[in-house]
Amino acid sequence: GMNPNTNEAKVEYSNDPSNPTTGVPSVPDVVDVHTFDFTVNKYFMADQQKSPLSGVGFRLYTDKDCMNEVKVVQESAGDGQNAAVYRKAKAEESGVEAITPAFGKIQFKGLDAGTYYLKETTTPDGYNKLTGPIKIEITPTYEKEKLTKYEVKYTYNDKVVVVSSDKKDQSPTIEVENKSGTELPNTGGIGAVIFTIAGVAILAVVMICSMRSKKRKHS
């Protein structure tokens, strides 16, 4: 949701030039500096229904190559109704891998607006691992210097989804499906080229064998 961190600034001023040490505090300027969050719902399909998947690990980064990690620490374990919460770590804290619980939902909170990359780092046996990171863009909207909502746009395998929040306790949810086996690269990538070349090679072998078989029959 939209989480304000309130900063106050006070200035003391003196009306007595002969006694500059005595100050009168001004009315504090209050500024809300917002941080943002999003929730990951990790699931697999069973009988055409979404079923939560536990034991999936994620790490968050600020770059596409996943070198600059945004370290997080677990704030709460959650329950069936509320996601397990991982907040942005403080400078003195060591980060951890965010792991989906039995109900499959984890929330990343305390984030600045901007672009992030969510990488699946641990996958349970029997399920696929995502072939690349999910790109996540957090964009706030302000009206008269007041935050009214923010959008979370996430992109994976050329599929783009936008979810938004305009309430303090509303966390935009990123839906991430796991399938059994290994996920193929998206169509149009190098994976598709490799499979196309392999298909052409197999077809050529079949045609050569067929031609040789016909020649033997004629001879």
Predicted regions and their residues:
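Solvent-exposed loop/turn and edge beta-strand elements of beta-rich ligand-binding domains
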Residues: 1-219
